[in-house]
């Protein structure tokens, strides 16, 4: 009994359970009269950092989303790089699979949303809301299945979600960002060059990559682009090749894993899942905006991912990840309908100033669509994934 409990606490499934508990707690606190103001006060607590002439002043919510989540994306970057170099994405046709899947997972949900809202000039600006995937929550749900999930399937989700996030960042920059700082982007470019040079000269001190990475993160943050992108870039440049039996990338990935699973992701869930339902009515649920979001996330995501994957295999543009089945890909497609925080962020950019009522209705659609995707995606994966024999 004790050994079983120890195995569970040390498993990915335990991290998924903590994340879901944190999300549920946030929803309760945000929608209870005597705790909602405490919850909001915590999220809005200002935290300032001064280093010379550099001044960063963000509230607690933004520090979690921009700083801590950059660490999460650093670990994701390390994992994807490992699979690109020597794993399930090592060939061009294997690597093309998640790229094609991500394109389908963005295009089809956006088109379905526009089927519902294309005639409304204001509502149609939210077309990108169902195109996003919340990688943290999707991985949290996947983690509930523990060692039943093949590594290739997890890497497929990671790669797909990263490309999806990159697509969302590009969409935000092109359609929802009024001004970008050219100077900050230039500094970010210089930092990327510095990381490339460190890798080129086989510098194996992880601390140097982190130091340059902090400069990169700060520049990206100041540029107006989503700062978590810096984490992925850093992860791609940390050396993977073993020397004297040690790999900097593998060592860093191993060191980050418990911090990400048991602290960063639960904090992220707690800070972002507390969406107030104040002003949401049952009649609002059946308006075109939330229905378009729900259909885009719950139907458009799996349809787009599955259809584009099927076409890619049939046209011999890509191959299924080794050891996976098409049923598993469909189930992962459903799971990718968890838009949640990235969708809420895009909705706030699309409707926050123009129409607060539309922002409320879009949140309702995001919550329902993402919840449906999480529950059905988990149940489908539980059904299609083989059960692993317990180790005595």
From Swiss-Prot:
State whether keyword Transmembrane applies. Answer: yes
The membrane-spanning stretches of this chain are 8-28, 60-80, 96-116, 126-146, 155-175, 181-201, 206-226, 255-275, 279-299, 329-349, 360-380
One GO biological process term: regulation of pH
List keywords of the entry alphabetically: Antiport, Cell inner membrane, Cell membrane, Ion transport, Membrane, Sodium, Sodium transport, Transmembrane, Transmembrane helix, Transport
The record describes its membrane topology as: Multi-pass membrane protein
Q: Which GO terms describe its cellular component?
A: plasma membrane
Query: From the Swiss-Prot or TrEMBL record, what is one GO molecular function term?
Result: sodium:proton antiporter activity
Look up the domain of life of the source.
Bacteria
Which residues are the signal sequence here? none
Q: Which Pfam families match?
A: Na_H_antiport_1 (PF06965)
Q: For this protein, what reaction is catalysed?
A: Na(+)(in) + 2 H(+)(out) = Na(+)(out) + 2 H(+)(in)
User: Where can this protein be found?
Assistant: Cell inner membrane
InterPro entries from the UniProt entry = Na/H_antiporter_dom_sf, NhaA
Its family remark reads: Belongs to the NhaA Na(+)/H(+) (TC 2.A.33) antiporter family.
Q: Which PANTHER family match?
A: NA(+)_H(+) ANTIPORTER NHAA, SODIUM ION/PROTON ANTIPORTER NHAA-RELATED
Q: Its biological function?
A: Na(+)/H(+) antiporter that extrudes sodium in exchange for external protons.
What is the recorded name of this protein?
Na(+)/H(+) antiporter NhaA
Q: Give the organism's phylogenetic lineage.
A: Bacteria, Pseudomonadati, Pseudomonadota, Gammaproteobacteria, Enterobacterales
What gene makes this protein?
nhaA
């Amino acid at each position: 009994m004790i050994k079983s409990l120890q195995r569970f606490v040390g498993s990915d499934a335990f991290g998924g359970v903590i994340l879901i508990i944190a999300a549920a707690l946030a929803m309760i606190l945000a929608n209870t009269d005597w705790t909602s103001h405490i919850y909001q006060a915590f999220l809005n607590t200002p935290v300032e950092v001064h280093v010379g002439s550099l001044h960063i002043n963000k509230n607690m919510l933004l520090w979690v989303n921009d700083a801590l989540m950059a660490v999460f994306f650093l670990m994701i970057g390390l994992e994807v790089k490992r699979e690109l170099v020597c794993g399930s994405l090592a060939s061009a046709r294997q690597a093309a699979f998640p790229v094609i899947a991500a394109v389908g997972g963005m295009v089809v949900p956006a088109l379905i949303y526009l089927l519902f809202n294309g005639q409304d000039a204001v509502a149609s600006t939210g077309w990108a809301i169902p195109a996003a995937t919340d990688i943290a929550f999707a991985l949290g749900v996947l983690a509930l299945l523990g060692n039943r999930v093949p590594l290739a399937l997890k890497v497929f989700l990671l790669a797909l979600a990263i490309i999806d996030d990159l697509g969302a960042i590009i969409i935000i920059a092109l359609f929802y960002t009024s001004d970008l700082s050219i100077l900050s982007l230039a500094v970010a470019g210089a930092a990327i060059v510095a990381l490339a040079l460190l890798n080129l000269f086989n510098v194996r001190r992880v601390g140097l990559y982190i130091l340059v990475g902090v400069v990169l993160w700060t520049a990206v943050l100041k540029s107006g682009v989503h700062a978590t992108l810096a984490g992925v870039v850093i992860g791609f440049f940390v050396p993977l090749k073993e020397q004297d039996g040690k790999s900097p990338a593998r060592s860093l990935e191993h060191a980050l894993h418990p911090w990400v699973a048991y602290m960063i992701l639960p904090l992220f869930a707690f800070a972002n899942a507390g969406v107030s339902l104040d002003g949401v009515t049952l009649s609002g649920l059946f308006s075109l905006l939330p229905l378009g979001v729900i259909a885009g996330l719950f139907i458009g995501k799996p349809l787009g991912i599955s259809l584009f994957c099927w076409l890619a295999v049939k046209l011999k543009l890509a191959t299924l990840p080794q050891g996976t089945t098409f049923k598993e890909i469909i189930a992962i497609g459903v799971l990718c309908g968890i838009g949640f925080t990235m969708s809420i962020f895009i909705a706030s950019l699309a409707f926050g100033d123009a129409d607060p009522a539309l922002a409320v209705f879009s949140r309702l659609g995001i919550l329902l669509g993402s919840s449906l995707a999480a529950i059905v995606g988990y149940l489908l994966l539980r059904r299609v994934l083989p059960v692993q024999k317990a180790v005595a």
